[in-house]
Regions:
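Charged, low-complexity, helix-prone segments enriched in Lys/Glu/Asp/Gln
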Residues: 78-81, 85, 132-141, 156
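Hydrophobic residues embedded in beta-strands of well-ordered beta-sheets
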Residues: 99-100, 107-110
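Surface loops and adjacent helix of pleckstrin homology
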Residues: 104-105, 114
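Compact, glycine/acidic-enriched structural inserts
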Residues: 110-147
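Hydrophobic alpha-helical interaction segments
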Residues: 142-163
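A surface-exposed partner-binding patch
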Residues: 1-101, 162-187
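Short alpha-helical interface elements
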Residues: 53, 62-66, 117, 134, ...
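Membrane topogenic helices and adjacent juxtamembrane segments
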Residues: 1-5, 109, 141, 152-153
Length: 187
């Protein structure tokens, strides 16, 4: 599979997170995904960090007959209600405390905030999610180098918002909440 017209490359992701912090999905695991998402997940991958956790906890094994990446079976396993339209969506990981899932048919990415029974649109597609995570990693590095938090927040919103306005459309988006914490010195 070739990387056709993707705005993020495997090299950019590895440079931002390091090779050991990139998780790739096997092509077979993405067979029911839209072609663009399947290509990105198997060729570019997802980062794994404190901000975005893309790997399962090996200390929390699941029964052999459970698919923990499909939201319906995952939510059922934990005794949580799962909105009917999202039962076939696939879990990608956690962004801070929000479970992040993709609708494999459309490629749209949604967040299930902790303590909420519903979900909100997070990104127009998986490419936008990975793009935002790479930009957020740059923000983290600059924050560690004492760049002004308000400048970092403004720049992140400008760069990511120009690529995809969805991450900032909902006031309770995990991106908006984390940038608010950054601006208020809670990091």
């Amino acid at each position: 599979m070739t990387l056709v017209d993707l705005s993020i490359t495997p090299i950019q992701l590895v440079q931002a997170y390091g090779l050991v912090n990139v998780a790739y999905l096997p092509q077979g695991a993405t067979a029911d995904f839209d072609a663009r998402s399947a290509n990105l997940l198997s060729s570019v991958g997802l980062p794994h960090s404190e901000v975005f956790t893309s790997r399962e906890d090996v200390e929390d094994p699941y029964p052999a007959d459970l698919d923990p990446t499909t939201l319906g079976s995952r939510f059922d396993h934990y005794g949580m209600p799962c909105p009917a339209e999202s039962r076939s969506w696939r879990m990608l990981g956690y962004l801070f405390t929000s479970l992040v899932a993709v609708d494999p048919a459309s490629g749209r990415v949604y967040a299930f905030p902790e303590g909420s029974a519903g979900y909100i649109a997070l990104h127009r597609d998986v490419e936008s999610l990975v793009y935002a995570l790479v930009e957020f990693r740059k923000l983290e590095v600059d924050h560690d180098n004492d760049v002004d938090p308000e400048e970092l927040s403004r720049r992140f919103k400008q760069v990511v918002g120009a690529f995809d306005p969805v991450p900032f459309a909902h006031e309770d988006s995990q991106w908006n909440l984390s940038l608010e914490e950054l601006e208020h010195g809670m990091w």
